[in-house]
Each structure stands twice: as structure tokens, then as C-alpha cells.
UniProtKB/Swiss-Prot annotation:
Transmembrane segments: none annotated. GO terms for cellular component: cytoplasm. It comes from Shewanella baltica (strain OS223). GO terms for molecular function: 3-dehydroquinate synthase activity; metal ion binding; nucleotide binding. This is 3-dehydroquinate synthase. The gene is aroB. CDD domains: DHQS. Belongs to the sugar phosphate cyclases superfamily. Dehydroquinate synthase family. Zn(2+) binds at E183, H246, H263. InterPro entries: Dehydroquinate_synthase, DHQ_synth_AroB, DHQ_synth_fam, DHQS/DOIS_N, DHQS_C. It comes from the Bacteria. It catalyses: 7-phospho-2-dehydro-3-deoxy-D-arabino-heptonate = 3-dehydroquinate + phosphate. NAD(+) binds at residues 70-75, 104-108, 128-129, 141, 150, 168-171.
Amino acid sequence: MKQIQVDLGVRSYPIYIGQNLMSDGETLSRYLLKKRILIVTNETVAPLYLKQIQETMASFGEVESVILPDGEQFKDLAHLDTIFTALLQQNYGRDSVLVALGGGVIGDMTGFAAACYQRGIDFIQIPTTLLSQVDSSVGGKTAVNHPLGKNMIGAFYQPQIVLIDTLCLHTLPAREFAAGMAEVIKYGIMWDADFFQWLEDNVTALKTLDAQALIYAISRCCEIKADVVSQDETEQGVRALLNLGHTFGHAIEAEMGYGNWLHGEAVSAGTVLAAQTAKALGLIDESIVCRIIELLQAFDLPVSAPESMDFDSFIQHMRRDKKVLGGQIRLVLPTAIGRADVFSQVTESTLEQVIRCA
């Protein structure tokens, strides 16, 4: 079992990565003793893992569950209220703990519910998708979507522990696994050139779910995320680099309707647009764009935006992006494999050129 620490002073917490961790009551015990436990999951994950995690936790306290519909389109205030209603109807107090058992949607919603309920209760992340294991479960970003923008209503709120059981990936649909790989590849592009090269060399091992390859890839992503979050918890500086591909990607998700494109698929296409923007600005050359495209394609990811999206469709959503400052769109762009920076002087005419030529 691999352990990584997110260093945030009194709010520090461990990430555990390994196989069959959902049956490891010893690791969870210190976070659950004498607490009332509410597991939040969805209709897809519940038949697979809810009974297992309930049995693991039953010896530590009273365990209940709430099961939500599955999909990004349900990550909204109405379904957040379902969690609050369950907590209130069953008289959960501040000594309770919420457990997020699922992917990024469940993790984001459960974390936000924990941040809000009685002004803050403990929560635990047990991510079951690759995307949530390498990205959304770590760092304390919690939110729900609004019809006008993704993750617009939320809070920074850290979990007590992140428990990553890589065996969950064996029940993950291939499309969901590929979507998670978009975030894995992102880390190589924006932070670690050696890791990017390792990914290029280990496509087959990852696609066949080789145990050691998965643990290494997930661990490296979590190490990078933990390092970045420890430096910049609330995204005032270096943490913004983790948004590589996300400004374009969020525009795709919002325009196409949440759930029609998976988040990772939108990030993949958005990462290519970011690379093409960097090339248009002279920051990188065509060979780097090609390496990025080829690695994304190796994992069966989209490398272009939907044909139905034009420049006007993109720009109206990008102007609402959370990174906009002083009315200026700020983009994370690669400056090399393994490096990226934030740019706020990218003109809309440059963006129009890139989007029209993509």
C-alpha cells in the first residue's frame, strides 16, 4: 500500500493507494470510531461496492446510505438537497461523517454537503473512477453545477482521508477509464516530462490494467496534486496549472449538456486546443502538439471539439470561467512537455483563429 500526505497543517490528510483497501477496516478505523456514518453513492456504484463498504464500516458506528442518480447532469442543487434531507431526517449531528463512494460527481457533491451541513462535518473520499482517483478526490475542491456554468457553486473543503482501491478500475467501463487518462496525461504535460515519457512507453500496460502500472500512475498523479495543493490550497497561484485544458473543456461540457461528453473527454479536446493556442503564440512547436495528440489518441480520447461548436459557442462560456480576472480570459497553456503557465493576454482573435482551424 502506498501512502502520500497532503500537507496543509491542521488540515493535512493521507492518501492511501493499493488493492482491496475497501475491506481494510484498520486503515479507516481512526476516522470512523463512535461516529454516525452516511455513505453517499450512486445507482451504478451501489450494486458493486455499497455492501462491501457497509460491512467494513459496520463495526465502527451506525451506517446509513443515500443513493443518487448517476451522471454529471445530476450534479446540481436539487440533488445536493437530497443529501441534506437524508442528514436532517435521520438527525445527523456534527459528530457524523459523510463518505463519498463514487466518481467525481459523488465526491464533489458529498464534499460540498459536508462543508455546508451544520457549518462543516467530516467526510471521507473513496473514489471509484480513475478520474476521481487521480484528480477530483484530492485537494478539497467541492461544488455543484449551475445551468450557466460548471462547478460555479462550491467551497474548498478537505477530506479526512482519501482511500484509493485500484481494484475498482476493473469494473469501470472503458470509456470512463479513457476519460480518467485525460487527467493523468495532463499531469505529465503541465508538471513532469519524465512521467509523460513513461505514459508514452506504458500505454499497453495501463490499458490492460496492469496492477503495478496503475498504482505507479495513480501515485505519481496524487504526488503531484498533493505537492501543488500543499503550496496553493485555494488556487491563488500554482494550483491554477492543474486547469490545463479545463477552460476549453468546461465550455464543451456546458454547451453540449452535462453528461453528453464525459469530463475527461472534454478535458482531452480542451488540452489539444490549449496546445494549439500555445503553438499559435509561439510557445511550443508542432512536435509537442503532435506528441500530446498522439498520446491522447492512444487512449481513445477525442482530440477535437464537437463539430457543432463554433467560436461564439466557446467564447460565451469561456467568459464565465472562474479564472477570469478583470474581464480577461486566463488560459493555462503548455510551454514545454512538463511545463505550463497562466496567460491572460491571449486575444479573442487568436482564440477564434485556433478554434476555427481546429
